[in-house]
Amino acid sequence: MITIKAEVRKDQGKGASRRLRSAGKFPAIVYGGSEAPVSIELDHDSVKNQEAKEGFYGTALILSIDGKEVQVKVQAVQRHVYKPKLTHIDFVRV
């Protein structure tokens, strides 16, 4: 099973997201189930490497959010228009 490390986002908004992306990270969100939605940040290069694996979109993944493991599936992916970059991912809890 694929494991991805994540951190809880401290800042929200367009400016904070742009700073994340320029630092080699990007924003994401985890929602669903009985818990509240959680905004997270992911390392772009590590997620891009995991995305190339066969089971990234079809199977459950494990997100390690500040040490707490959550089982999720990819709900939606947003990409840059012409660069090979991820800009945002929505995860839904399994």
Curated annotation (Swiss-Prot):
One cellular-component annotation, GO: cytosolic large ribosomal subunit
Instruction: From the UniProt record, list the coiled-coil ranges.
Output: none
**Which controlled-vocabulary keywords does the entry list?**
Ribonucleoprotein, Ribosomal protein, RNA-binding, rRNA-binding
- Signal peptide bounds: none
Which branch of life, at top level?
Bacteria
Classification via SUPFAM superfamilies:
Ribosomal protein L25-like (SSF50715)
Q: Per the UniProt entry, what is one GO biological process?
A: translation
GO MF annotation, one: structural constituent of ribosome
Which Gene3D superfamilies does this one have?
A: Ribosomal Protein L25, Chain P
A single Pfam family it belongs to is Ribosomal_L25p
Q: Does the keyword Lipoprotein apply?
A: no
Function of the protein: This is one of the proteins that binds to the 5S RNA in the ribosome where it forms part of the central protuberance.
Q: NCBIfam families from the entry?
A: PRK05943.1 (NF004612)
Q: Which family is it part of?
A: Belongs to the bacterial ribosomal protein bL25 family.
Q: How does it assemble?
A: Part of the 50S ribosomal subunit; part of the 5S rRNA/L5/L18/L25 subcomplex. Contacts the 5S rRNA. Binds to the 5S rRNA independently of L5 and L18.
Protein name per its UniProtKB record:
Large ribosomal subunit protein bL25
- Gene of this entry: rplY
